[in-house]
Amino acid sequence: QGWTVKAVLNNDIVGGSCGSDGHCDDTHVRVFSEGPRADLSEQARAAQRRNGGENDSPSRNLSRWLDNLAEQDPAGVDVRQIWRADRMGRGGDHIPFLEAGYPAVRFSVAVEDYEHQHQDLRVEDGVTYGDTVDEMDFPYLAKVTRLNVRALDHLAGAPMPPAPTAKAAVRTFTEISWDRVPGAASYRIWQRRTDEPYWRAMPASVVQASDKPDYSIDLAGVRGDDWLFGVSSVSAEGIESPIASAVPGGGYAPLVSE
């Protein structure tokens, strides 16, 4: 239908806080995100293998963004990032979106209760099976819902993330380039060491938007071999998009459309 999809948030399962073994955790929600994106072409996969980016898919950066957003709500639920596409040996409704090239993550409870999911209502050997309302933790569900609503509000108000590239071969500086993003009032350039899991707390630079079709900035003295780079777009109201990494396949659009 020609829609632009910024992100897909799949919530499954998010209503309980106690697991099959009786362990309870009502302070975290797990967010699953893929590493190398599912729609990489062989050419893009080869480029990523040489230049890095296996931990910088749009979905992985969406997960980082959600983690930061959750930290801004002390009374809410904390995000536990799970850096795999889904639970071991299982799948979810976000997977087809990933395969189509759309950034997608899965929200799921911190601990699973296997007796009360995908089960017919019954009692066996004294154990009650089935999805029943008495197993719900509604205050926990409310916190997960609040995080989702805040995420949707921010995603709707933010411009699309850019699609940056980084050039740093055989030079003592790094050039970051990207095309203009409609609705962006400014852009923030981010960096982190290649072995760091999270972006630095402060941007490396800020570029104000204009009417020109593309942008480029040189980071003097920054040897690109040692760093990963990203760019986020910011609306006039100050709402920031997730970061897009300047790596092969780092943009948020499906690669099949390129």
Where are these predicted regions, by residue range?
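Metal-dependent peptidase/peptidase-like ectodomains
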Residues: 1-92, 100, 104
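Active-site-adjacent mobile loop/cap segments within catalytic or ligand-binding domains
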Residues: 17-30, 82-159
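Proline-enriched interdomain boundary motifs that mark the N-terminal boundary
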Residues: 158-168, 256
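Conserved aromatic anchor
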Residues: 172-184
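Extracellular low-complexity, O-glycosylation-prone stalks/linkers
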Residues: 184-204
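Short beta-strand segments within Ig-like beta-sandwich modules, predominantly Fibronectin type-III
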Residues: 202-212
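Beta-strand-rich modules
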Residues: 217-240
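Extracellular fibronectin type III
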Residues: 234-258
